């Protein structure tokens, strides 16, 4: 039975508050993704406003 057993080892390191992606901590990656998402959303809002104005001008 000992050959079929599975051991799970959980190691906690309190020095690193965030998991790391390569050399950058996850907090930097989260800020990068948040910045890109913000830029995308702002661009989407601007394009929506422009298209609504063009559509309104075309219909009126």
From Swiss-Prot:
GO cellular component terms given for this protein: host cell membrane; membrane
Principal location: host cell
Presence of the UniProt keyword Cell membrane in the record: no
Topology in membrane: Single-pass membrane protein
InterPro entries (UniProt xref): Herpes_UL2
Similarity comment text for this entry: Belongs to the HHV-5 UL2 protein family.
Full protein name: Uncharacterized protein UL2
Gene: UL2
